[in-house]
């Protein structure tokens, strides 16, 4: 509802603008303009130059619009606005604005979608998914640089000479480094040749796995068997020695035993004789007694 209705007047531009310190003074003429009349003076407005920060924002917005290119991409079943915005580094609002989408579900009514990307960005190089939307002119064929054969040969020889010089310098530097390192550290062992295996010097004492197996077999089987066989042979030899000693003692004592038995028999036989005869017999048997 309109509160007050009054006569409408056309836009009247200022007649002059005066700039002062920190402000602008606009002066208008007192003349009245007809309601139905329209002249070009209504649109002849002086262009005011914006100041520092505003001018930078305007330039940035213009550059932003100029650096954006629209690329077209086919829509699949799994696509949505958030996924496309994250994938191509743009805003959902920009995609909606370019494709005239009102809601997020409107994307499924399209077969292809336009995506705003930077002109010289990495996404513009993905030609397998995106195609230029506003490129009406056919791409210009790449111009092949054709150099004369003599110049190409000269360049080839030149680059080969450079490569050879670099290789020689690298070899000399390597030799000098090895010599200086050998002079600075004479006590260090020589460098290990590639492919040559050196024994380890850790907690395993540098032994191999088959050495460990051999030591376990030696300690667990060979030494116990040798110990048992040795003491068994020692026991057999001691038993044989004791039996032989007993046999020798009995053999050495057998003559004396026989002599004693013969003396007893003679004593029993001569028990009926006289004591003098027995004494004579005893003296004959024991001349030293």
UniProtKB/Swiss-Prot annotation:
Bridged cysteine pairs (disulfide): none
UniProt xrefs under InterPro entries: LYSM1-4, LysM_dom, LysM_dom_sf
Transmembrane segments: 209-229
GO cellular component, one term: membrane
Membrane topology: Single-pass membrane protein
Main subcellular location of this protein, as a coarse class: membrane
Subcellular location: Membrane
Keyword annotations: Glycoprotein, Membrane, Transmembrane, Transmembrane helix
Sequence ranges on the Cytoplasmic membrane side: 230-289
Region (Disordered): 1-23, 252-272
Extracellular side: 1-208
Glycosylation sites: 30, 59, 134, 178
LysM domain residues: 71-115
Biased composition, class Polar residues, residue ranges: 9-23
Protein name: LysM and putative peptidoglycan-binding domain-containing protein 4
Natural source organism: Xenopus laevis (African clawed frog)
């Amino acid at each position: 509802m309109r509160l007050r209705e009054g006569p409408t007047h056309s836009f009247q531009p200022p007649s002059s603008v005066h700039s002062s310190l920190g402000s602008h003074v606009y002066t208008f003429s007192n003349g009245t303009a007809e309601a139905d009349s329209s002249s070009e003076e209504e649109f002849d407005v002086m262009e005011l130059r914006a100041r520092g920060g505003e001018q930078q924002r305007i330039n940035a917005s213009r550059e932003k619009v100029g650096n954006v290119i629209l690329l077209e991409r086919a829509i699949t079943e799994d696509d949505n606005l958030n996924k496309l915005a994250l994938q191509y580094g743009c805003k959902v609002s920009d995609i909606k604005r370019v494709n005239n989408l009102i809601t997020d579900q409107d994307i499924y009514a399209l077969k292809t979608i336009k995506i705003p990307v930077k002109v010289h960005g990495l996404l513009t190089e993905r030609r397998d998914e995106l195609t230029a939307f506003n490129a009406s002119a056919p791409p210009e064929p790449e111009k092949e640089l054709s150099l004369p054969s003599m110049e190409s040969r000269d360049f080839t020889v030149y680059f080969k000479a450079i490569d050879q010089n670099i290789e020689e310098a690298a070899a000399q530097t390597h030799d000098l480094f090895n010599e200086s390192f050998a002079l600075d550290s004479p006590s260090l062992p020589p460098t290990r040749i590639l492919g040559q295996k050196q024994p380890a010097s850790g907690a395993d004492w540098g032994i191999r796995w088959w050495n460990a197996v051999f030591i376990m077999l030696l300690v667990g089987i060979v030494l116990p068997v040798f110990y048992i066989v040795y003491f068994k042979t020692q026991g057999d030899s001691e038993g044989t020695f004791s039996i032989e000693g007993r046999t020798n003692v009995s053999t050495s004592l057998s003559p004396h035993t026989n002599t004693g038995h013969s003396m007893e028999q003679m004593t029993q036989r001569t028990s009926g004789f006289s004591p003098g005869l027995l004494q004579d017999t005893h003296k004959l048997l024991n001349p030293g007694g």
